[in-house]
A protein has these predicted regions:
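Solvent-exposed loop/turn and edge beta-strand elements of beta-rich ligand-binding domains
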Residues: 1-179
Length: 179
């Protein structure tokens, strides 16, 4: 039988220590490669091919132990994204500088500055940014309004699912009423 180029011969899963053992019969004298075909959702799927060959070791050798990647650990890279928010006056649509926002784990119940993973203040363009956010679901809430504006109780849920993903949101705010 002929094995087609790039055909899947076998697959294996990592054990609890992160080790993988492929247990299959491969013909000797050929070049092969191992490649990641699935990973945990938190990680970037690698397209790296780890090449190796099977050389004849003599008739008394029944099993060949092959190490890939020069016997070094293969690292998986976490998915990271960012959040870019825009703070706008509800009535005038003008951008608002000086509002403080917090980023929280999705299971956080008290959305306070002390419990925030990160905080950011809107700049002169009304923009705040949270960078290098790992894969997952988060909450964003305004912690302190800009001068002259009312507290905003809106809570935004954002999800980072893809590497280098930018989640954009717009937060509206009302001015303190003039008496």
């Amino acid at each position: 039988d002929v094995i087609p180029k790039d055909a899947l011969i076998t697959f294996a899963n990592c054990d609890k220590n992160g080790s993988i053992v492929f247990d299959c019969d491969l013909p000797v004298g050929f070049k092969w490669y191992a490649k990641e075909i699935a990973t945990d959702a938190h990680y970037i799927l690698s397209d790296t091919k780890y090449e190796f060959d099977t050389e004849y070791q003599g008739q008394d050798i029944k099993v060949i132990d092959i190490k890939i990647n020069n016997d070094k650990a293969i690292e998986n890279n976490l998915i990271y994204g960012s959040v870019k928010g825009l703070k706008v006056d509800r009535e005038t649509q003008e951008v608002i500088k000086g509002a403080t926002f917090g980023l929280f784990k999705s299971d956080t119940t008290e959305l306070t500055e002390e419990n925030a993973i990160l905080t950011a203040v809107t700049d002169e363009n009304g923009i705040f940014t949270f960078s290098n956010i790992p894969y997952g679901e988060y909450l964003i809430k305004e912690l302190k309004p800009a001068d002259g504006y009312l507290d905003n109780e809106d809570v935004f849920t954002v999800t980072i699912k893809n590497n280098e993903q930018v989640v954009e949101l717009t937060a509206l705010n009302d001015k303190v009423p003039e008496l």
